[in-house]
């Protein structure tokens, strides 16, 4: 069998949000029995069929890089972590739906990975300084995933999901909310599975079919500009 082409997707978010459990579920379609803290970075692989069911279908390796640590780490730690950000093709931003702080920190995680967390003055950009325009021209595909959906009380679910919808909109990304202990949330044919497949297709298209991806990106940007004008 010929070697498969591959893409690199970072999985970023605060410690304890369930990144390792999510990656295990994505790669093995199984619940991770005994999750532990990730030190440094852990890499797992998912096999993905690009444009499945079409004449263009082709199989790729999706490398999922689960990066550990805290977004508020010292500069020396962040510099070490920056090694993992080289040659990235996509980013999955993971937050705990029961922890609002983990959602807010996604702004800082994304800016750090995209080398935009430091202003020309050297001052750290906080999520309070976040400007949606910073991502308007971002060409790295993003996906926002909220975990621990099962732990949100029914009385608060609408409030939480409304807030996370705005979060995904800020990143110009689709969102998936799930419980990592229940594989049915990513069952084949489900809306979540479709979103996930669409995200991986975007990552592959950006990496291996850039001209096609660029035309779609520019069309999408033009559409957003027209919506803002009206």
From Swiss-Prot:
<comment type="subunit">
    <text>Homodimer.</text>
</comment>
<protein>
    <recommendedName>
        <fullName>Rab-like protein 3</fullName>
    </recommendedName>
</protein>
<feature type="region of interest" description="Small GTPase-like">
    <location>
        <begin position="1"/>
        <end position="230"/>
    </location>
</feature>
<dbReference type="InterPro" id="IPR027417">
    <property type="entry name" value="P-loop_NTPase"/>
</dbReference>
<dbReference type="GO" id="GO:0033077">
    <property type="term" value="P:T cell differentiation in thymus"/>
</dbReference>
<dbReference type="InterPro" id="IPR025662">
    <property type="entry name" value="Sigma_54_int_dom_ATP-bd_1"/>
</dbReference>
<dbReference type="Pfam" id="PF08477">
    <property type="entry name" value="Roc"/>
</dbReference>
<feature type="binding site">
    <location>
        <begin position="148"/>
        <end position="150"/>
    </location>
    <ligand>
        <name>GTP</name>
    </ligand>
</feature>
<feature type="binding site">
    <location>
        <begin position="16"/>
        <end position="21"/>
    </location>
    <ligand>
        <name>GTP</name>
    </ligand>
</feature>
<dbReference type="GO" id="GO:1903059">
    <property type="term" value="P:regulation of protein lipidation"/>
</dbReference>
<feature type="binding site">
    <location>
        <begin position="179"/>
        <end position="180"/>
    </location>
    <ligand>
        <name>GTP</name>
    </ligand>
</feature>
<dbReference type="GO" id="GO:0030183">
    <property type="term" value="P:B cell differentiation"/>
</dbReference>
<dbReference type="GO" id="GO:0005525">
    <property type="term" value="F:GTP binding"/>
</dbReference>
<keyword id="KW-0547">Nucleotide-binding</keyword>
<dbReference type="GO" id="GO:0006886">
    <property type="term" value="P:intracellular protein transport"/>
</dbReference>
<dbReference type="GO" id="GO:0012505">
    <property type="term" value="C:endomembrane system"/>
</dbReference>
<dbReference type="GO" id="GO:0042803">
    <property type="term" value="F:protein homodimerization activity"/>
</dbReference>
<comment type="function">
    <text>Required for KRAS signaling regulation and modulation of cell proliferation. Regulator of KRAS prenylation, and probably prenylation of other small GTPases. Required for lymphocyte development and function. Not required for myeloid cell development.</text>
</comment>
<dbReference type="GO" id="GO:0003924">
    <property type="term" value="F:GTPase activity"/>
</dbReference>
<comment type="similarity">
    <text>Belongs to the small GTPase superfamily. Rab family.</text>
</comment>
<dbReference type="GO" id="GO:0046578">
    <property type="term" value="P:regulation of Ras protein signal transduction"/>
</dbReference>
<dbReference type="GO" id="GO:0001779">
    <property type="term" value="P:natural killer cell differentiation"/>
</dbReference>
<keyword id="KW-0342">GTP-binding</keyword>
């Amino acid at each position: 069998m010929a070697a498969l082409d591959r893409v690199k997707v970072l999985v970023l978010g605060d410690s304890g949000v369930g990144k390792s459990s999510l990656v295990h579920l994505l790669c093995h379609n199984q619940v991770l029995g005994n999750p532990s803290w990730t030190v440094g970075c852990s890499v797992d692989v998912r096999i993905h069929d690009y444009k499945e069911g079409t004449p263009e279908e082709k199989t790729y390796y999706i490398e999922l890089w689960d990066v550990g640590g805290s977004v508020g780490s010292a500069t020396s730690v962040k510099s070490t972590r920056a090694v993992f950000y080289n040659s990235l093709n996509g980013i999955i931003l993971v937050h705990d739906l029961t922890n609002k702080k983990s959602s807010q920190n996604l702004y800082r995680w994304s800016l750090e990975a995209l080398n935009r967390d430091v202003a020309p003055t050297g001052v750290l950009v906080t999520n309070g300084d976040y400007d949606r325009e910073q991502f308007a021209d971002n060409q790295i595909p993003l996906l926002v995933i909220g975990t621990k959906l099962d732990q949100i009380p029914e009385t608060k679910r609408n409030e939480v999901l409304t807030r996370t919808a705005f979060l995904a909109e800020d990143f110009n990304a689709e969102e998936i909310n799930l419980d990592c202990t229940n594989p049915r949330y990513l069952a084949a044919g489900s809306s979540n599975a479709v979103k996930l497949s669409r995200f991986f297709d975007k990552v592959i298209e950006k990496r291996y079919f850039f001209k096609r991806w660029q035309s779609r990106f520019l069309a999408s940007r033009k559409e957003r500009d027209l919506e803002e004008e009206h």
